[in-house]
Amino acid sequence: MLSRSDRSAVEEVQIDGELCAIIISAEYDDLGIQFFTPNEFSQQIASMSYPSGKVIPAHTHNPVRREVFYTQEALFIRKGRLRVDFYSQEQEYRTSRVLSAGDVVLLIRGGHGFEVLQDLNMVEVKQGPYAGDMDKTRFSAVLPPKLKFD
């Protein structure tokens, strides 16, 4: 569970009562392991922070068959600024957020679009194998005259 001081550094973006994204601000800083996703998500995201000298035991991961129905992707902003526009599953604009260097977003469900606000370098992580055109439905972004940042 996040402490009160950490809550502002981690935001859950809800659309129509469903969790569509988790944003972890560059300011988030807590010792130990903090998972931000429930166990049933097909993409897990956690913060791990330890003092110098901490030993993490060597390990391998066992083969476990999993079924993935939706692609969930994590974006790690290394440099620059990126606006993320969030859409409902019905492709209707709902809200936007601006990410900066050091921020991380896990895109869970719903639609999303992006505008690069400052020269950007980011890393994307998502499940594979890539399904090509079957993996996504592209749509025309209909943005309101004034974006929402609630």
Language-model features, listed with the residues they occupy:
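Short, surface-exposed beta-strand-loop junctions and turns on beta-sheet-rich folds
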Residues: 64-65, 90-92, 121, 129-131
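Glycine- and acidic-residue-biased ligand/ion/polar-headgroup-sensing regions
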Residues: 51-52, 70-87
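Short acidic-glycine-tyrosine-enriched beta hairpin
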Residues: 88-109
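A short, N-terminal "cap"/entry segment at the start of jelly-roll beta-barrel domains
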Residues: 1-47, 142, 149-150
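Double-stranded beta-helix
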Residues: 113-150
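Short beta-strand His + acidic residue motifs that chelate non-heme Fe in jelly-roll/DSBH
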Residues: 58, 84-85, 105-107, 112-117, ...
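Conserved short histidine dyad/triad with adjacent acidic residue
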Residues: 47-69
